[in-house]
C-alpha cells in the first residue's frame, strides 16, 4: 500500500516507536487531524464501563484530562460505543442530541463534531473526538480521521489496564 501525500499514517506509526508514549502519539494525532480536517478541540477518551474517561485534551482548562462522562446508556453511546459507528454532528442540533454538556461546548464556539470509535476485539475501547465551528465537518471528513483510530489501540488498552489496577488497589 502506497501512502498518499496527505496521509499521515506512516509518520504516526513511526511516532509509536519513540519514547514518551502515549503523550507523544496523542500530540502527533492532534496535529495530524488538524492538518487533515481541522478542529478547535481534540479529545481522546477510553471506555471504562458506562463511562468514558479523558486521557488527552487540546483544551485542558475546559476539558481536563481524567475527566469522565457517563455515556454508555445514551443515544450517543448506543451509536458510537455499542454499534461502533462514527458520529458526525454537523450543527448545534447534533451537539445537543449527543452531549449533556452542550452548553459548555457551545460556549466555546463549537457546533460540529466527529466522534470515531477506536475498535479492538469487536468492541469500542475508546473514542477520538474532533470539534469545530458549526457546519465545519462533512461526510468526507470522517473516513480520513477514522483511518487513524487503530493507532490508539495500545494506548487505550494501557489506560484501561492502569485504571483497573488502580481500582483493584483501592479495594484492598
Regions found by a protein language model. Give the residues of each.
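Signal-transmission linkers at sensory-effector interfaces
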Residues: 1-18, 168-172
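Short hydrophobic/aromatic beta-strand element in the GNAT-like acyltransferase core
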Residues: 41, 102, 115, 127
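Regulatory sensory and allosteric helical modules in signal-transduction proteins
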Residues: 47, 62-97, 106
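A short, aliphatic-rich beta-strand micro-motif
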Residues: 112-119
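Juxtadomain coupling helices with adjacent low-complexity linkers
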Residues: 132-172
